[in-house]
Amino acid sequence: MPRLFVMLPAYNEERCLPPLLRAFQKLFAELPASYDPLIVIVDDGSQDRTARVARNAKKKGFPVELVKHERNKGLGEAIKTGLNRCLDHAEGPDDVIVCMDADNTHPPRHVVEMLETLRVEDADIVIASRYRWGSRQHGVPVHRQLMSLG
């Protein structure tokens, strides 16, 4: 059975992770039974209780693995660490890795569309972007949208 890895680089996301994990729990219940899901949370030296949230989710039986950086190394290193951990667990060519922000600004429901695109297009990679022409950002405060412009 192919694995579905959801890799979440996280820095001080104790408030955002619980609703995001609940959304993934709902999504996993709706996924075809052909995927074995695992969420890999990379806590990039958070100063809050991000790691505790991940550990508690695992204790409740949720498919979560926590990887912790002792100090903040930045988003790039968190992504690299997370991808390497997913690859350590990969079992075959049909495994899928989804990388999303842990701040709950990307609705997990889009994962289903991405999986369908992989299947229909026989693609190796699908990139979803809120910056694509005609796309919109939902749930992101205006000041954060402006900061993203550079």
Name these PLM-found stretches.
Residues 8, 32-46, 67-68:
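Short beta-strand/loop segment that forms part of the nucleotide-sugar
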Residues 15-19, 48-52, 73, 77:
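Residue-level preference for short helical/loop micro-motifs built around acidic side chains
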Residues 27-35, 57-61, 85-94:
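Alpha-helix termini
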Residues 43-51, 104:
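A conserved acidic beta->alpha catalytic loop
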Residues 69-88, 94-99, 105-150:
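Acceptor/aglycone-binding surface of glycosyltransferases and processive sugar-polymer synthases
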